[in-house]
């Protein structure tokens, strides 16, 4: 029984280590240089209003995508509502009747 438990602990440790190597683990910080180690990434809210009226999904963007964006459309009451939030390499172009707001820091399109 102890051998099985030890094997599971070793397996979990190996799996967590390999997840960090491929970028699936949490961000690692070099304390001496005070900067992130590995491929740079940012986090943006990523959701579609049709699927989720409240946007609570905040996810890690693909490496190289440093722009968070929110697309707005008129709501019929004289105002506008967001319809899509996500990340991209560059700020997307607004379509007819749309407005796009882009920002360039982590979690900046949350509201």
Curated annotation (Swiss-Prot):
Potent postsynaptic neurotoxin. Displays readily reversible competitive antagonism at the nicotinic acetylcholine receptor (nAChR). Pfam families: Toxin_cobra-type. Belongs to the three-finger toxin family. Ancestral subfamily. Boigatoxin sub-subfamily. SUPFAM superfamilies: Snake toxin-like (SSF57302). The modification Pyrrolidone carboxylic acid is found at residue 35. One of its GO terms (molecular function) is acetylcholine receptor inhibitor activity. Expressed by the venom gland. Disulfide bonds join 44-68, 47-55, 61-87, 91-102, 103-108. InterPro entries: Snake_3FTx, Snake_toxin-like_sf, Snake_toxin_con_site, Toxin_cobra-type. It comes from Trimorphodon biscutatus. Residues 20-34 form a propeptide. It is found in: Secreted. Residues 1-19 form the signal peptide. This is Toxin 3FTx-Tri2. Keywords: Acetylcholine receptor inhibiting toxin, Disulfide bond, Ion channel impairing toxin, Neurotoxin, Postsynaptic neurotoxin, Pyrrolidone carboxylic acid, Secreted, Signal, Toxin.
